[in-house]
Amino acid sequence: MMARRTVDFKKLIEQLRARATDKAEALNTVSQLEIGAVDAQDVTASAVRAFVGALPSSGYHFGFVRQNVVFYLLSHATVQTARDPLYAAEQLHEQLDRFLRHQHDGGGDEDRLPFYHNGATLTAFQKLLQTLREIQTVIAEQSGGTAAAADLIASNNASTERRGKKGGSSSGGQQPLVRRVITQLETAATEARPYVNCRAVAELLDLTYQRLIYWACTLMPYVLFRRDTDTELDTVLLMHFFYTHYRSVNGDLAVEFQNYVKNSVRHMSSFVSSDIDGDQKPGAEHMRDVSYKLFVGNLQARDASGLMFPIISTRISTVNLYLSPERMFFHPGLISRLLSEEVSPRANLDAYARVCDRVLEDHLHTPRRVQRLLDLTQMVMRLVELGFNHDTCAAYAQMALIQPASQKSSLFVSEIREKLIQIIYNFYTFFMCLYVYSPTFLFDHRRRLILEQHRSTLIGSKEELQHVWSNVTLNVNTHFAVQYTEEDFEAHTKGATEAEREYLYRDLHSKWGVHLFTLRPSRGAAGAASPLPPLDGVTRSDILRECALVNLNEGRVNYASLLAFSHHPEFPSIFAQLVVVTEFSEIFGIPQGLFQAVGSPRLFALIQLCRVLLPEQVTLYQNLVSIYNLTTFVKHIDAAVFKTVRDCVFDIATTLEHLSGVPVTPNVDLLAELMARSVAHNLYTTVNPLIEDVMRSSAGSLRNYLRHTRLCFGLARGRARLSEDGVTVYVEVQGQYGLRVPTTRFVEQLRELVRRDRLLAENLRGLNERLLSVRVRVRQISSDTEEVSRHAKGHRTVAQMSKALKKTASKIKMLETRVTLALEQAQRSNGAVVTAVQRALAVFDVLSRENLERRGAQLCLTEATSLLHRHRALAPMTWPAGTGVAAAAEADGALREFLEAPWESAPQPPRLRMTPDTDHEESTAGATSVPEVLGARYEPAHLAASDLLNWYIVPVSQAQQDILSSIDPPAGSTSVSLPPASP
């Protein structure tokens, strides 16, 4: 269970009163507040008076705290624990104001510290609260739809209508109100700049910025983004996008979509696939929702039936005809195809390549430094116009994540894929940062965690994508350039003493971390107020003796005896070697289960020692504070948290080696346990979704392929015989069942079998790639543990975790191998059946009417005979001897269903009576000279000899000549007339 970050303010005051005469103990006490925080709801006027009265009158930074207590409490108070942070801040202001009204001395020196004295700080805080209350009221009214907000929006909408309905990222609707509120907030943040590092101020700005950004990003009406040049497919995808993600301002789209589909349904049939397995085609799973809503003509419908329906096509050849290239990112199925490289190198991808190049050039290759929130919101509108928001970017990032790093595709296709990944990863991290943005140190921490965590997730060990992440990092730091500069610090601390500057800088360093500037002594600063006693006759032996007596087991710091030695030249080296290294190693050897109770207090005591006795080692202090906060107050140890702790530990080891002059090997017991929690969290949050995606996207294809394999097995077990007249096919299934199928239907079903085999093979191509991506992700997680493993050879937890990861990767590899082998065996056996079917179909194709007319009967019959001879020369197909009865029965049932079920009531081909009248009718009607092989058949009439009079009767030689000339006409001739009947 994580500890509370806030300290008990009343208890802290009591501790100060009890130790008022001991400045070192007083420093320990206030350090609890400075490293943690005080709950703003616990701060009252009387408590503030008691706090000031309990502080020592001199020493360290106590004088600054007593004179500028309003700034000090705002710097270390938190409002995040309150249900309504802004109300809690207003109550805090009221209590601080009450405290100042009863003070005889306003506190602080207005001339020396114009920004930090109590009166100026409280006035600035009050002004900020008033502005934030106004902004949050507007946002709440907008969200709640009050009358005042409605009137304002109506006036804005009216002005927008006068400008027309042309789409794009032009302002309109509620955008003027958004711009006004953003300007108001940015002005308030600029005026509060001297206090932006106060925790209470930073939290309020952080909360308001995030609420404003979220509100502004939901105001995306479809009317602003549609174009007159949009195709039917463009319109359907855009309506679905804006209704799904921005329904609050697009409620009327439901009716508009219904009417549009009703009036354009004929055109829309061109870009949907009605194949029975259309939802199993590459990328189709991402089009299922919009396809269902298009199918029923209702944006509010949800697919809960499990039925089949037409799916919007993801084929490049089809999409090219019906989708505008600049709308490509509204089509997730297309993006999935391009990312998986499920496209032919011959496909026309030039238009999409140009769109990618334009997006990269406009937004990513030469990013402009963003100075205002308004610039960010305008960029959001441009990205929405392209089809990007947080949800779509997350979906596209997941698509890219499950694809293997390299595939056997043409260079052009691979280049498009790499451009897509660069675009997606950039915009994904942009939206991740945007929704937690504020110009404060709180966002600076989040930005670093986002970059660290998503670098591990999205890039990992993929060397070919490292340059992509370098571009992502550059763009994030450019778009969200949040920092507190040395110029700001010098301007705000003008007139402060060195002790005050040191306290303020250390506080900044604990909040901003290593990205902060390095403090330089101020020329005009007043003298330091350090409580160090004089250094008289101190020897190395004295330092060694005092350092050997330090013991932090009780979690208390008693460094009064060491203060006299801290300015000795050899003190940092001896103190680091005998105290810090030892304590550092012992603390990180405490099991995690005991760390809250035992390790955390000792770590806090070590922080205090380093703060007082090694004041110049600010980085060491900051790393210790970071570890303390992350191990004490953070609940979920993910990859970013673990890597931060790990990096801090090894940075501390490097610093201590430099100070002590001896090698330092950190104890990794605690790191190993944190690593185990991080790995478990990573497996749950990154590998599990990949496995679920494999199951979701491939389950249908596997089921269909299993049915297809059973059918092919049934065909291999069966025998087919053509009737004498060629009209019917008789199928025997191991002599047990007899099927009678019209030849035309039989041929059609065989063609369907060949087509389905090709489609299913295409659908299953990505299964192995997805399984490979799971294994690659596990390998990336393993690589995150390598640095700890190098320092912990033989460590039990590390060894167990490495073994578990290897076992997981091995099982995934084994599953991948089993699936691959099973599919290869099935494809091999299915391929043999399909090849045999294709040979049979080749005979029918050779004897088709078109072929006979074009090439003549003699050549076609010769080729067909050759095909039959080659087919008969092949060995008959067999099946494994151990095939079970149940499997054989399932295969036979699949064959019966395949051949019989769809055609139970199918009509037989028409029969023509062979009479003089019908023959004459066929000739006079201009019928083609060569009928279909599987078409209508003559039915010989049983006529008497007298009925044959006046019909075609010639000598045998003449008949032979006429027959041959009619079925193999001379070149240029299309028909042969029968000679007149002889009497």
UniProtKB/Swiss-Prot annotation:
Bilayer-spanning residue ranges: none
Region Disordered: start-end pairs: 902-932
Keyword terms: Host cytoplasm, Host Golgi apparatus, Host nucleus, Virion, Virion tegument
Gene Ontology, cellular component aspect: host cell Golgi apparatus; host cell nucleus; host cell viral assembly compartment; viral tegument
Gene Ontology biological process: virion assembly
InterPro entries: Herpes_U30 (IPR007611), HSV_ITP (IPR034738)
One protein family per Pfam: Herpes_U30
Location in the cell: Virion tegument; Host cytoplasm; Host nucleus; Host Golgi apparatus, Host trans-Golgi network
The keyword Calcium is assigned to this record: no
Biased composition (Basic and acidic residues): 914-923
Region Interaction with large tegument protein: start-end pairs: 474-983
Oligomer status and interactors: Interacts (via C-terminus) with the large tegument protein/LTP (via N-terminus).
Family: Belongs to the herpesviridae inner tegument protein family.
Protein role: Plays an essential role in cytoplasmic secondary envelopment during viral egress. Interacts with the capsid via the large tegument protein/LTP and participates in its transport to the host trans-Golgi network (TGN) where secondary envelopment occurs. Modulates tegumentation and capsid accumulation at the viral assembly complex.
Protein name stated in the entry: Inner tegument protein
Primary gene name: UL47
